[in-house]
């Protein structure tokens, strides 16, 4: 299978998000990369489903709560920027203060 670097990145984010979901199911708090991956995957999949940018920017801030991440992680993540493919092209989506 020949994948472009962009496709490899998307696959890696998707896999990291799957690991994060499993850890949350077990009650394990997420670390920095897991939290970023979960939020990023939410945005990428939402874009694929055709949800508008503004909706994803708002909804992305409700994917993870402070009680689901390790201490100090919420303060480390101020913005998450994801380049996602929408039906009308690729756009940069920024989720501000994603862990509340």
UniProtKB/Swiss-Prot annotation:
Question: Per the record, what are the reactions this protein catalyses?
Answer: urea + 2 H2O + H(+) = hydrogencarbonate + 2 NH4(+)
Keywords of this protein's UniProt record, alphabetized? Answer: Cytoplasm, Hydrolase
Which of the seven top EC classes does this enzyme belong to? hydrolase
Q: Which GO terms describe its cellular component?
A: cytoplasm
Pathway where it operates: Nitrogen metabolism; urea degradation; CO(2) and NH(3) from urea (urease route): step 1/1
The record's subcellular location field reads: Cytoplasm
The organism named in the record is Rhizobium leguminosarum bv. trifolii (strain WSM2304)
The protein's Enzyme Commission number: 3.5.1.5
The annotated subunit structure for this chain is: Heterotrimer of UreA (gamma), UreB (beta) and UreC (alpha) subunits. Three heterotrimers associate to form the active enzyme.
**Listed name of the protein:** Urease subunit gamma
Q: Which SUPFAM superfamilies match?
A: Urease, gamma-subunit
Q: Name one GO molecular function term.
A: nickel cation binding
Q: Which GO terms describe its biological process?
A: urea catabolic process
Q: Which family does it belong to?
A: Belongs to the urease gamma subunit family.
